Regions:
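Divalent metal-binding pocket/active-site signature
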Residues: 1-55, 67, 75-80, 98-107, ...
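Hydrophobic faces of well-ordered beta-strands that scaffold small-molecule active sites
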Residues: 6-8, 37-40, 60-62, 85-89
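Generic structural signal for secondary-structure transition and capping sites
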Residues: 26, 57-58, 82-85, 144
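Short, acidic/turn-prone active-site loops that include or flank metal/cofactor-
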Residues: 43, 64-68, 91-93
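Conserved catalytic/ligand-binding micro-motifs in nucleotide and anionic cofactor chemistry
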Residues: 71
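Glycine/small-residue-rich hydrophobic helix-like segments
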Residues: 79-91, 96
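Crotonase-superfamily enoyl-CoA hydratase/isomerase domain that binds
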Residues: 97-99, 113-114
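Mid-to-C-terminal alpha-helical segments outside catalytic/metal-binding sites
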Residues: 107-158
Length: 158
């Protein structure tokens, strides 16, 4: 096996996806394997989050929907643990406020980070640190490896 995480993109089929993930997680465990991955563009309710959280080692990709004024995702994010989140875009779609209606790009990640921080009552730096740790863990990056480039904080551009 390659022991790689999966990226799951589901629309309007979360109940079916929950059943599938539960079945596949059980099958993987029976073989001594670990099913893990990311639920891309997650924008569901807290009940769906809790159900999927029990299914295995999955992260929840939070993107440009969270800043939308009528997004139910804001209520869900308040209940989610930072250790379960990664920041993402759905480029070129789901552009966060204040750029909604324009082409999405990774440069808008700070808006998502800031909104999550506000919802969680923490700092953008803490959200950025937690979601970076989560991504490094999920994708097997060596946490001790440091780049030689001086990268700015994801919140500095705002």
């Amino acid at each position: 096996t390659y022991d790689l995480p999966v990226a799951i993109h589901t629309r309007a089929a979360w109940k079916d996806m929950c059943r599938t993930v539960e079945t596949e997680t059980k099958a993987a465990r029976e073989k001594g394997l670990r099913l893990r991955g990311v639920f891309h563009a997650f924008a569901e309710d807290a009940d769906t989050y809790r159900q999927l959280k029990e299914c295995g080692d999955f992260l929840f990709g939070i993107g440009g929907v969270v800043p939308f004024k009528k997004s139910r995702l804001a209520d869900t994010v308040r209940e989610m643990e930072l250790d379960d989140l990664v920041l993402e875009t759905d480029c070129p779609y789901l552009t966060p406020v204040p750029y909604r209606g324009q082409r999405n790009e990774s440069g808008y990640i700070p808006y998502i980070c800031n909104k999550i921080a506000a919802l969680k009552g923490t700092t953008p730096e803490e959200v950025a640190a937690a979601t970076t740790r989560n991504a490094r863990r999920m994708f097997g990056f060596d946490a001790a490896r440091q780049t030689t480039n001086d990268h700015s904080s994801p919140t500095e551009s705002i």
